[in-house]
From Swiss-Prot:
It is found in: Cytoplasm. SUPFAM superfamilies: Urease metallochaperone UreE, C-terminal domain, Urease metallochaperone UreE, N-terminal domain. GO terms for cellular component: cytoplasm. This is Urease accessory protein UreE. The gene is ureE. One of its GO terms (biological process) is protein-containing complex assembly. Involved in urease metallocenter assembly. Binds nickel. Probably functions as a nickel donor during metallocenter assembly. Belongs to the UreE family. The keyword Glycoprotein does not apply. Keywords: Chaperone, Cytoplasm, Nickel, Nickel insertion. InterPro entries: UreE (IPR012406), UreE_C_dom (IPR007864), UreE_N (IPR004029), UreE_N_sf (IPR036118). It comes from Pseudomonas aeruginosa (strain UCBPP-PA14). Its main location: cytoplasm. GO terms for molecular function: nickel cation binding; unfolded protein binding.
Length: 167
């Protein structure tokens, strides 16, 4: 079994093996899967990190470099007649904590018939496609929780913005 404990800080121009993973699989810190070659792989990554992205590199215990490839999966590709309608669609999806990939004039989310119906009721054009899924990470680290301010275990710093900081 190829055992992987290490995420590399930068992408590498060379690699020895590839892992083709869905978004759900790339979100796990512990995973048993198979490399493109068929070799069994055990991922034991540090918990609390962002999901692996397409092109990320990992180092196996035996020194081999492993490149992550985002496997195509069934998605909903959402477009709208106006930026306002697209913003409304994004708002309603965000209100439901849906993982969302944001592009120039479009949104993508994992296929879900309930969300598809909601988006169509909002006037969006929704097309089912097969593509790699690379959603936004979110503004805060540490995942979803309902902590109280000041509890050290859950007092995560913002990832995208420093609210209230003036320079």
């Amino acid at each position: 079994m190829l055992v992987i404990h290490q995420r590399l800080p930068a992408r590498s121009p060379r690699w020895d093996e590839e892992l083709h993973l869905t978004y759900e699989a790339r979100s796990k810190s512990r995973l048993r899967c198979f490399a493109a070659s068929g070799e069994e792989v055990g991922l034991f990554l540090e918990r609390g990190q962002p999901p692996l992205a397409d092109g990320d590199c990992l180092e196996a215990r035996d020194g081999r470099l492993v490149r992550v490839v985002a496997r195509p999966e069934r998605l909903l590709h959402v477009t709208c007649a106006s930026p306002l309608e697209l913003t409304r669609a994004a708002y309603h999806l965000g209100n439901r904590h849906v993982a969302l990939q944001v592009g120039d004039g479009w949104l993508r989310l994992l296929d879900d018939y309930v969300l598809k119906a909601m988006l169509e009721q909002l006037g969006a054009t929704v097309e089912a496609i097969e593509a790699p899924f690379q959603p936004e990470h979110g503004a805060y680290g540490g995942g979803h929780h309902h902590s109280h301010h000041g509890e050290a275990e859950f007092n995560y710093a913002p990832r995208l913005h420093q609210f209230g900081v003036r320079r």
